[in-house]
Each structure stands twice: as C-alpha cells, then as structure tokens.
C-alpha cells in the first residue's frame, strides 16, 4: 500500500527531563528558550515550513496547559497595553504564533509504559489509516534547512516507503553517543537496523528525532513490545517494520543538534544566536575578554 504524503505531524514532549531539574518541575523542557523562541516553536516552524497543515503536540498533563496557553491564548491585555504605549510592533511575534496552522495539544496516555514511543502511540486517533505522518522529537533542533521537508520530498521519491528516517553523518569517534544506522542496501539507502550507542558502530550515520512514519508503526507501539530498560521505543518499532518492508534513510541537509541535556542545550542556544541574532559579535567579544 502507498500512503498519502504527510500533512500532519506529531511533536513529542511528554517526559520529565530530570537532567534539567528543578526548572522542568514547572516548565516543559521544550519551552526553554533559544533566543526569544522556545525550542518547541522552532520545531513547529520546521514543520510549517515543510507544508504541514496540522500539528499534534503530546505533553505531560502539566505541560499541556502551558502549550495550550502559548499557542492559543490571544493575550489581548498585552496587545492593548503595547498599543497604548506605542509599542504594538513588539506583539508581532505573538501574532505569528497565534497564526500557525492547526495545533492540538494532548496528554500522553498514562496507561502506556515509559518510553519515547508512547507519545506517538497516544496520538493514534489523529492519524488516518491511509496517510503517512511526521514524528518530531522536541529534543532535536535542525538549523539551516527543514529535515521535515527533506523527509516529505523523500516520500515523493519513494511512495513504497513504510517509513523514512532522518540521518546525519557524525565523526566516527563520536558514534558511540548515537543510534548508528546499519543499511540493508547502501545504493537504495534502506534500513537494516539501528545500533544504539555502540563502540562498534556499523556506519557514521546517526539517526535522530525526525521520522516519516505510516500507520504500520502502531502495530509495534504496543505495551507488549517493551524493549531496553522496560521502555517502549519508536526505534524498535521502526526496525521491526524494516524486517518486512522498505524503510529508507534520508541524509538531511540541515545541521542537527540536540537540546537533551544542559551542555548541548547551551551549544544549541549558541548556534541559534550565531544564526539569528546580531548580538553574537558581542558574545564573541565577551568570551575573548573573559
């Protein structure tokens, strides 16, 4: 079966981000800022730039309220105050957020086991049986190009795909930090397996949190299929699909960085400032002088 090209994306932020405590006791990790935009907004914008029409954000019960407020509250009092002060142009970034395509925020199904596959499974009712869809982990940001757009273009080239996963080449000596891709057919770029954090990586291609999936994945995102550490893993489901169907690997054009821990969050923030803010030169000067 050939599935329809994606128009929907599931973005996940349903964990508790214990490496960021105490701040994530109150604020979802993907609401931490890069410049004046939260990480989640950058992931949403990547999807919007690729033509995605509907986004489902999967959050914790506490995070759901915060994401609903951020993407849906019209903040009329703030706009009125800025208008009165003659600073209404400062409200333009808020209007941009409010004008995004349809965004629905849901809670992760609490009956599912822990693991990054459970937020995806929680959004099953939003996905039609005949359509492919995007899954994006909000831990990951992509600079310079939309990985979501790359995946959608790859789907047009491979309508037989049961899934397509994003990949980035990394230095070989660092591959023990990532999920290393093993290819079934190098010329066709089809997946055999993903080997997590191994000192004997089968390639220098690292898998990261951008996937084009089909409803086939829900057959395997089931509590009876828990894997390492008793968790439900999206990667496990994808490799099960690869056993009988074509899962393609797409080397994306942008630069992927993770925000999954404080160190890499800081590096991602620095990359953001370098790319988007004119005060980067002041930061370079400060670092040089101190």
Where are the model-predicted features located?
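Active-site metal-binding loops of divalent metal-dependent hydrolases
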Residues: 16, 140, 262
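Conserved N-terminal catalytic core of the sugar/cofactor nucleotidyltransferase
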Residues: 1-11, 19, 37-131, 143
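Conserved donor-nucleotide/metal-binding helix-loop-beta segment in metal-dependent transferases, i.e.
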Residues: 141-174
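Conserved beta-strand termini and adjacent loop/short-helix elements that scaffold enzyme active sites
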Residues: 106-110, 122, 166, 197, ...
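Short catalytic helix/loop segments, enriched in acidic residues and glycine
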Residues: 26-41
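Catalytic-core segments of class I nucleotidyltransferases/pyrophosphorylases
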Residues: 134, 148, 152, 156, ...
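Nucleotide-activated chemistry modules centered on ATP-dependent adenylation/adenylyltransferase
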Residues: 173-177, 181, 210, 214-215
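Active-site acidic Asp-centered loop
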Residues: 136-138
